[in-house]
Amino acid sequence: MSSEHQGDREFDVIVQGATGFTGTLVAEYLLRQYGTDGDLRWALAGRNEEKLREVRESLGSAASDVDLIVADSFDKTALQSLCERTRVVLTTVGPYALYGSDLVEACVNSGTHYCDLAGEVQWIRKMIDMHHDRAKQTGAKIVNCCGFDSVPMDIGVWFLQRAAHEKYGSYCKSISMLVKATKGTASGGTLASMMNLIKESREDRNIARTLIHPYSLNPEGEREGPDKRDQQRVIYREDAKAWTAPFVMAGVNTKVVRRSHALAGYPYGKDFRYDESVLSGRGFSGWLKGTVMTLGLGAIVFLASFTPTRNLLQRFVLSKPGEGPDRELQKEGFFNLMQIGVLPDGTQVRARITGDQDPGYGSTSKMLSECAVCLAKDELDDFGGVLTPAVAMGAPLIDRLRKNAGLTFDLRD
């Protein structure tokens, strides 16, 4: 176990937000993968006991013994009690900037590990400033970004660098993550978080600067480096022989990867570079597709910057928190990512990362679940803080993702 300071606790994992769409997917996965009479002790939590009972009933008779815990996101006493009963809290209650702060504080104070799906850079920065030092004292591992943003990217860099070092004796001086293909929809929670993030950035220039700065999640005094702003336009990549467009999640993922590198003590060197983009194809059609993608993303961000149009988007266009695709669409989904690393001598090292379900729901719920189980059950380095998936879990998490969550990490010739 990774946290001797926790002592004996009633549960290994408590799922907060179990009545939401993603929370229910997590509950289904834990039941299917770990059952209720095995080594993993888990419970469901939320603010409405009746809805919790409905979720438990929907899981079938095999879940009849799963404990239910009532805890509202703003009830500090209930949250503290919840955290003291478990090794890990897994939460799907977002936007986290609105609903997550008190739970993080309770986890830190009780030395309880924590994982979420937050992609809200401004809020993660706030949690680092408020709780990193205290979490180091209590041993609590506070791990944000445990879904499609940013597990495949953060763990992917960890994987490629170690594979490169093992094969060539040196780390890559740069890595590019290219999204080759995805099938699926962004979760309602992710979209709600994105809308709130844009809203807050319009109201507070400091938040806007945090979103733009490439090293804004790095430790204080370590926010300089070679990387600039994330890709903003269509660019032709000679190494991929294709056009690329901006990737909507790059603004989160790239900062998480850079924080991982900083927390690890800069093993790849302080001149290490990292970027992300979407492959749009070759020739004129690739350029045109990339241009349409870029303009479409820009249009959404522009419309979301103003209250009236943002409200219209949330009401009529974007999926809402608690909504999601049916099971067939989840199973039909997938993602396929390509990494291109460059060694100091110019040698290219490539890897492929894939997921077997839609990134927004099916794969994300499995990744988040395995992060929680990893924090609860695996032998991890015994230190706390506001961490990243790669720094907090590293190799044990890759093993779990490969074995249980349908992800692949492969070095390519």
Language-model segments: which ranges?
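Conserved glycine-rich Rossmann-like NAD(P)H-binding loop of the short-chain dehydrogenase/reductase
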Residues: G35-K51
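Structural motif
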Residues: D12, R87-V88, H113
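C-terminal catalytic/substrate-binding lobe primarily of soluble NAD(P)-dependent oxidoreductases
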Residues: S2-Q6, G23, R162-D413
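Glycine-/Pro-rich loop/turn segments that contact NAD(P) or position catalytic residues
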Residues: P95-S216
